[in-house]
Amino acid sequence: MRRSMPLAQLLPDIPQARDVVISGLVMDSREVQPGDAFVAVAGFGAHGLCFIEDACARGAVAILFEPPAPQGVSVPDGAIAVHGLRARLGAMADRFHGHPSQAMTMVGVTGTNGKTSTVQLLAQAWHCLGVRSATCGTLGVGLYDQVVPTGFTTPLVLQLHQCLAQLRDEGAQAVAMEVSSHALDQGRVDGVHYDVVVFTNLTRDHLDYHGDMEHYGAAKARLFAHQDVQAAVINVDDPFGLRLLHGLAKGMRRVGVSVCGHTDADVMAQHLSLNLQGIGFDLVIGADHASVRSPLMGRFNVDNLLAVAGVLYALNYALSEIAAVLSTLRPIHGRMNRLGGQDGQPVVVVDYAHTPDALGQVLSSLSSHVCGRLICVFGCGGERDRGKRSQMAVIAESNADVVFVTDDNPRGEDGDGIVADILAGFARPNVVKVQRDRSAAIAAAIGIASAEDVVLIAGKGHERYQEVAGVRHPFDDTEVARRVLAAMSAQETVR
């Protein structure tokens, strides 16, 4: 049954809101249902006022808009002007849905890399500890193991509060949420109550949006200024994280995590061991320590596990419980997923690494465990930060023995132009293998690999599509790699 509420409870200072009862708050006219209030604010393409006719035809009982109206766009009689409407939406949605984030343990995770892995691993840890958990992020929104894709890392503000209300109503006790810099800059998480917030790292990404690293970092830092946050878990090995830690508000619990033995750390990993079967380390909290043996691959997954450990520590779990549950956590789809490696086949690893730092970390993690060659397949997304393309080329050339450059998601950009931007970063572009057909590139990379080699397929990870000219075609790196490996096995059997 749909909720209803007098609009005056959400806008008590607006006289026109009296005597109107609404059943929902909606910003997309195509999603309006009878009884909803349609919220018209400026978007990236057009102002919401351009879609009032559609909203009214679908049954909107109130039109809320943020003045001034764009030139040439008429405002219908009865539309309610609300100054500062966008900034009020979070509080309005939170109240309309009955403050859902206050009914659950809420953890927000921000940072350039590691958000998805940390969120998914935390939800998995809660599940293992008997807590009914849910996630919100790149993979979608839903209870643990029941995630539905949304298309956003962090949903838009009205949609987000609606999702949180649904999770609460479905019995979620704890929610792990990715919080992107775009979401923080655009107010998508306004009105959300967080118990714990997490910072993973800050490296180059999204400069097409933020302009420079200073503004990018400032957007991330907004999460730590949210009202009523009880604790902050921060990677103090990251220089920006250390600055963040020392700038936290008084009274907020500070949990520094470190692999490097930083003096500001409360939770540390020591005596690391890494191989293609997994990672091991001693988890240290204060004077106590416990052993962790995890099937996850890669040095950076130690950081992700430490972030999870930091959250559980902030929520008052004991060291023994934390170490035990970390050892049970399984790999996440599209994050350092390992295939092959048997019957003379090479090991194939699929990972979402799509930033210079992430690609460098994955290649570095794999290179120390490869007996033969490290072969890398990667591309760069279209209509995104062009500056990182040449940087990723430098990293691939420095860390891999063989490099295939291919298409990622060209989107509306010319694929040949993207490849040219990437090749400009190679010192020896003539030895780079260019194959824009991603399936063919994956097949070629696996085809030249021996049993001692490792093939990294980077950039798309969990994605099950490839976006070309505005159309998303079915595509899954993992499935393509599986088919290639299966075909190799079949050929060996015939021989």
Curated annotation (Swiss-Prot):
The modification N6-carboxylysine is found at residue 220. Pathway: Cell wall biogenesis; peptidoglycan biosynthesis. UDP-N-acetyl-alpha-D-muramoyl-L-alanyl-D-glutamate binds at residues 29, 153-154, 180, 186, 188. One of its GO terms (cellular component) is cytoplasm. It catalyses: UDP-N-acetyl-alpha-D-muramoyl-L-alanyl-D-glutamate + meso-2,6-diaminopimelate + ATP = UDP-N-acetyl-alpha-D-muramoyl-L-alanyl-gamma-D-glutamyl-meso-2,6-diaminopimelate + ADP + phosphate + H(+). GO terms for biological process: cell division; cell wall organization; peptidoglycan biosynthetic process; regulation of cell shape. Carboxylation is probably crucial for Mg(2+) binding and, consequently, for the gamma-phosphate positioning of ATP. Its main location: cytoplasm. It is an enzyme of class 6 (ligase). ATP binds at residues 111-117. Its cofactor is Mg(2+). A motif (Meso-diaminopimelate recognition motif) lies at residues 408-411. Meso-2,6-diaminopimelate binds at residues 384, 408-411, 459, 463. Catalyzes the addition of meso-diaminopimelic acid to the nucleotide precursor UDP-N-acetylmuramoyl-L-alanyl-D-glutamate (UMAG) in the biosynthesis of bacterial cell-wall peptidoglycan. HAMAP family: MurE (MF_00208). NCBIfam families: murE (TIGR01085), PRK00139.1-2 (NF001124), PRK00139.1-4 (NF001126). Belongs to the MurCDEF family. MurE subfamily. This is UDP-N-acetylmuramoyl-L-alanyl-D-glutamate--2,6-diaminopimelate ligase. It comes from Xylella fastidiosa (strain 9a5c).
